[in-house]
From Swiss-Prot:
Topology within the bilayer: Multi-pass membrane protein
Function (record text): The VirB system could be required for the establishment of the replication niche in the host.
Tree of life domain: Bacteria
Coarse class of the protein's main subcellular location: membrane
Lineage of the species this protein comes from: Bacteria, Pseudomonadati, Pseudomonadota, Alphaproteobacteria, Hyphomicrobiales
Keywords assigned: Cell inner membrane, Cell membrane, Membrane, Transmembrane, Transmembrane helix, Virulence
InterPro entries xref list: Conjugal_tfr_TrbL/VirB6
Family recorded in the similarity comment: Belongs to the TrbL/VirB6 family.
GO cellular component, one term: plasma membrane
Protein name: Type IV secretion system protein VirB6
Gene Ontology terms describing biological process: protein secretion by the type IV secretion system
Compartmental location: Cell inner membrane
Residue ranges crossing the lipid bilayer per the database entry: 32-52, 61-81, 153-173, 177-197, 205-225, 245-265, 270-290
Gene name of this polypeptide: virB6
UniProt miscellaneous comment: Transcription of the operon is maximal in early exponential phase.
Length: 347
């Protein structure tokens, strides 16, 4: 019996190397951007606070405090390797395994053993090829035609099996490598969430990771289907039967093997399309949330600054804008206060 461990050995070796690579690159990226991020963030929020206090910038002070707290939380994820590994790297790997399990169905193979599944499919086909080769090799001179046919069929089955498992393993290994590279440089893109002009970088980085996860999950689903079909067709080949056409069974197996890689290629392509749409939806939802919050804040400001205070508000308005503002019915505006004080200091 042939029990190959080709893909399992390659996949496990690459997976271990990629895990070390992610940790090393993420740590180096954090060390590179930590000083710049702390200095830039500190200077930015210090300058914004000073400008707001002297009236050069209008806006509620609470918004600046909330923005500063949000930046510190983002920095805690982007500049600490243990937090990043636990909350980001492990989460992405769990998403990959979860999507692969869900898309593969009840009898699907988890993504952690997908390389073993490839080896099992490869071993089943090669076992049939080995039996065909042995049977053809044992033919005598009087059965040279049958022996030659079985030898040819053995090579046909072995090649078809490799064509089925090879591209799938290559695409999964390549996609996992892409995920590892994206996770390695992830701290830079997570830190980009701290400033509005650079938030789009995080959306595109997250979209690329989701695209890779969907591609692995969809490949797992197709692999589960193709492995079931392949195993059933291989089990139907009975070399000892005098009535079954071995040639027809092998040709059917070859036809299925040609169709399945094309299906995997199309599924891989559609995974990229779905991931791109999720990325675009993330950006749109982020913009929608910002616009909604801005509109809601403006509406609440109008409500609290326009009608609170009852009848006293009308008399305050009649007395002038300065007394109305002093009554506590409007938000604190340093620029407006400076303008009012300037009116009193005029000659």
């Amino acid at each position: 019996m042939v029990n190959p461990v080709i893909f399992e050995f390659i996949g496990t070796s690459i997976h271990n190397q990629l895990n070390n690579y992610v940790t090393m690159v993420a740590s180096n990226t954090m060390n590179m951007i930590a000083t710049t991020a702390v200095l830039a963030g500190g200077l930015y929020y210090t300058a914004m606070g000073i400008l707001m206090s002297v009236g050069r910038i209008e806006g509620p002070f609470s918004q600046l405090v909330i923005s500063c707290i949000k930046f510190m939380l983002i920095a805690a994820f982007a500049l600490n390797i243990s937090t990043y590994s636990e909350w980001v790297i492990d989460t992405v790997h769990n998403m990959e395994s979860g999507f692969a399990d869900a898309f593969a169905g009840n009898h699907g193979t988890p993504s952690s053993t997908i390389y073993q599944t490839l080896d099992n499919s490869l071993g089943k086909g090669w076992n049939i090829a080995a039996m065909l080769f042995e049977k053809g090799d044992n033919r005598g001179l009087t059965q040279i035609v049958q022996g030659f046919s079985e030898l040819l069929l053995s090579f046909l089955v072995a090649g078809s099996t490799l064509i089925l498992a090879g591209p799938t393993g290559a695409m999964i290994v390549a996609t996992n490598a892409v995920i590892a590279i994206l996770l390695g440089i992830g701290p830079l893109f997570i830190l980009a969430l701290g400033w509005a002009p650079t938030r789009g970088f995080f959306d595109r980085w997250f979209g690329a990771i989701v695209t890779s996860i969907l591609q692995v999950a969809l490949l797992s689903a197709v692999l589960s289907i193709s492995s079931a079909i392949f195993s059933r067709m291989v089990a139907a080949i009975n070399l000892a039967s005098a009535t079954q056409s071995t040639l027809f069974s092998c040709l059917s197996l070859t036809a299925v093997t040609i169709v399945m890689p094309y299906m995997m290629y199309k599924v891989y392509e559609y995974g990229g399309i779905l991931g791109s749409s999720i990325s675009a939806a993330t950006i749109s939802l982020g913009s929608l949330a910002v616009n909604t919050a801005t509109s809601g804040g403006g509406a609440m400001t109008s409500i609290f600054s326009g009608s609170s205070g009852g009848g006293g508000s009308g008399s305050a308005k009649a007395g002038g804008e300065s007394s109305y503002s002093a009554g506590g019915n409007a938000m604190w505006s340093p620029a407006y206060r400076q303008h009012v004080l300037g009116q009193f200091n005029r000659d």
